[in-house]
Amino acid sequence: GRQMARLPVDVKLARMLVAANTHSVLHELLIISSFMGIQDPRERPAEAKEAADNAHRQFTDNASEFMAIINLWRGYRQAHEECSQSQLRKWCEKNYLSYLRLREWRELHRQLLITSQELQWPLPAWQDVEQRLVLGLTESKSAQLHYALIHRALLAGLPTQIGHKNDKGQYEAPRKR
């Protein structure tokens, strides 16, 4: 509880981060929870829905929307490192992403990173995380375990968002809602 109170995000997101620390997937959950703490930076204007969908497709992950968020972060991070501010704005525009919301995401991620360091939560080097994420694209047992641990940490903060498809093809939430 005390650790969660220090995190500058909603209680559900803070719970995910505590679980992520336990499961050693904190780096990935810092990315996902900071994304969930802002308005979605992906833009989809009515007049360019198909073009926006095509631009966003480069970040998709067939198995998980949460992994797509990590892909988006990696793409943004690379563009942020390689581009000037005006080039980054053009990259955002070309990819139908809100420059201001991406900046807000980066700032919230930075705040969460600093707080996690103050809490003395261990963080692997970014290169190690990159290697884990690349391995996540394979079907190895360790990659599957890593993927499962990310989703287990996510579920810690979203217990009411879990659903089960019944025999009639309808989804039921916990407590049969």
Question: Which residues does each predicted region cover?
Answer:
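Second RecA-like catalytic domain
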Residues: G1-K176
